């Protein structure tokens, strides 16, 4: 029966090719959507890792060192730096603002850190900012060394380029000295949003708590939670569409082969063998569509303006999902096979 199923697929190859390509496009888009949702976390992790900070110390009650931070004076910096387990400590700041580009504006995320860190990422061109009116800009902004940019209400000179530094769905990051950020965001008041630590403090002064890198990443992606959930809903809908496409083709094939199934039953072929042949068709379609989907995902990903980072687990899970979809999609056709009367084999045309 399996051979008969494969021969039937060969006979209907044009229909199967169209089905495989259509389902493959669905699989490819699902992978891309998965990569988009994961890309938000990948870019946030890249930003946090580039700072070289092991632990962020924030005020108690803060939701994170960046977007969920509570600004506080840096009066306890020396006490935190002197705690056992702390190798280095630096005052850090973070604020969202706008940058003017001619007559238009764009959002940027501003980070403040000492020139030599921790908290200041490595630059691919130029040097790290050392003065309040200097800035290291993300390479995604298209700026060059020596350019002047207007961030918030301040005009800053670009002295360094940080490679591909973005967060919050490709919003570029810019890095100032801590003093520069304080002038930009707090009118020069010595406020910070966190203390970046290299090492692991054994205890902290009262009124403070810590976030590790994972917690810092979660803080950066928190505003994107609704977007990620929306993407997940669309991905689920695409899986349903894939089931409907494969299921409709298998069901039509079953309807067209009712006389064949009746003949098979009349000559004593077990129903389970007939059902296995029909299920095989659905599995072959789904697995070939999965291969097409992987290829299409690689082609489509660079076309998106945001980071598409498809996790390895998604590629590994796709064949399994394809098998499940194939089996689920074949249910309607299998039910039709069970109800076929062998007497139809002896009926008229």
UniProtKB/Swiss-Prot annotation:
GO terms for cellular component: extracellular region; plasma membrane. It is a multi-pass membrane protein. Pfam families: FtsX, MacB_PCD. It comes from the Bacteria. Coiled coil: none annotated. The chain crosses the membrane at residues 16-36, 231-251, 284-304, 307-327. Residues 111-139 are annotated as: Disordered. Keywords: Cell membrane, Membrane, Transmembrane, Transmembrane helix, Transport. The complex is composed of two ATP-binding proteins (Rv0073), two transmembrane proteins (Rv0072) and a solute-binding protein. It is found in: Cell membrane. The keyword DNA repair does not apply. Belongs to the ABC-4 integral membrane protein family. This is Uncharacterized ABC transporter permease Rv0072. Probably part of an ABC transporter complex. Probably responsible for the translocation of the substrate across the membrane. InterPro entries: ABC-4/HrtB_transporter, ABC3_permease_C, MacB_PCD. Residues 124-134 have a biased composition (Basic and acidic residues). Its main location: membrane.
